[in-house]
């Protein structure tokens, strides 16, 4: 029995149950940005996938055929999430296609990483980074599903107070890093 596979499946089921019980039923009442911005912010943290390339975060012998695609796939997805955040915050016409691009690339990256970890038996070499596929990947898979659901919904309308707070915080952060 592959313990990582069991962890991955059970964690995914648990996150899916949480989404089914609490998030999916609330979607019709929520503005899209209220849901998509926190998901994009979560995925912006996928730069942590670079840990698969960090000595000490993984054990020696981690298969390069798994580590490099997983690490750089996560990094690319994190960058796409950041780009999509800017588009969503600015209510750009590119928001929907950029969120879609982020979501397809990110979901395919996770599927690829799961397949490569299985094919190349990466689990015994993951060391402290084991928590990424045991916890993060299931949560991220479920949020990708939620974003696919959101992509089929309306993308206009007034912002609620919580959205306005997120948008203002993102705008302030953007201005802080872009001004000399």
Place the predicted regions along the sequence by residue:
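Alpha-helical transmembrane segments in multipass membrane proteins, preferentially the mid-helix core
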Residues: 76-91, 146-150
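Hydrophobic transmembrane alpha-helical segments in integral membrane proteins
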Residues: 1-15
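Short, highly charged, low-complexity non-transmembrane loops/tails of multi-pass membrane proteins
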Residues: 157-177
């Amino acid at each position: 029995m592959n313990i990582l596979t069991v962890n991955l499946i059970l964690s995914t089921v648990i996150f899916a149950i949480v989404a089914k019980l609490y998030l999916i039923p609330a979607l019709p009442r929520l503005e899209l940005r209220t849901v998509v911005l926190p998901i994009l912010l979560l995925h912006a943290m996928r730069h942590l996938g670079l840990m698969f390339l960090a000595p000490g975060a993984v054990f020696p012998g981690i298969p390069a055929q798994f580590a490099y695609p997983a690490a750089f796939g996560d990094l690319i997805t994190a960058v796409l999430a950041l780009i999509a955040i800017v588009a969503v915050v600015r209510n750009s016409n590119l928001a929907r296609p950029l969120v879609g691009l982020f979501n397809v690339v990110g979901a395919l990256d996770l599927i690829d990483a799961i397949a490569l970890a299985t094919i190349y038996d990466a689990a015994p070499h993951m060391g402290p980074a084991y928590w990424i596929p045991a916890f993060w990947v299931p949560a991220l898979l479920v949020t990708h599903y939620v974003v696919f659901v959101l992509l089929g919904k309306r993308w206009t309308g007034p912002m609620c107070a919580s959205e306005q707070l997120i948008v203002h915080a993102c705008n302030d952060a953007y201005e802080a890093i872009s001004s000399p």
